[in-house]
């Protein structure tokens, strides 16, 4: 399995599918499934029974995972979707950078 280009906390843009063009912050990365949960995107409705946690019950909206092939990291310099590369910085540490601008992604 190859290394994933997306990490928790990244701002990503959807490049394909129903939410194409929308962006959000990554809440969780599901490595084995190669999917990510992005804040406010790919919303699904779940019917919940009343419980101690949710005494009212009803229909709840929540984020569903999106396959990482449909996501690109947003370039911090330009604000547009970009591919990610890896290179050694001046300290000899491997860092991610935006291919479009060359800006390091933290």
From Swiss-Prot:
Record flagged with keyword Glycoprotein: no
Pfam families named in the record: KOW, ribosomal_L24
Entry keywords, A to Z: Ribonucleoprotein, Ribosomal protein, RNA-binding, rRNA-binding
Phosphoprotein keyword on record: no
Gene Ontology MF terms in the entry: rRNA binding; structural constituent of ribosome
Gene Ontology cellular component list: ribonucleoprotein complex; ribosome
CDD domains listed in its UniProt record: KOW_RPL26 (cd06089)
GO biological process, one term: translation
UniProt function note: One of two assembly initiator proteins, it binds directly to the 5'-end of the 23S rRNA, where it nucleates assembly of the 50S subunit. One of the proteins that surrounds the polypeptide exit tunnel on the outside of the subunit.
Family the UniProt entry places it in: Belongs to the universal ribosomal protein uL24 family.
Subunit comment: Part of the 50S ribosomal subunit.
HAMAP family reported for this sequence: Ribosomal_uL24_B
UniProt name for this protein: Large ribosomal subunit protein uL24
Organism: Porphyromonas gingivalis (strain ATCC BAA-308 / W83)
């Amino acid at each position: 399995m190859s290394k994933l280009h997306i990490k928790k906390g990244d701002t990503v843009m959807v490049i394909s599918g129903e939410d194409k063009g929308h962006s959000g912050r990554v809440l969780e990365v599901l490595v084995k499934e190669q999917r990510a949960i992005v804040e406010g995107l790919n919303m699904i409705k779940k019917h919940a029974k009343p419980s101690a946690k949710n005494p009212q019950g009803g229909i709840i909206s929540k984020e569903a995972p999106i396959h990482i092939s449909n996501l690109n990291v947003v370039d911090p310099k330009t604000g547009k979707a970009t591919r990610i590369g890896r290179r050694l910085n001046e300290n000899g540490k491997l860092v991610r950078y935006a291919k479009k601008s060359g800006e390091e992604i933290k």
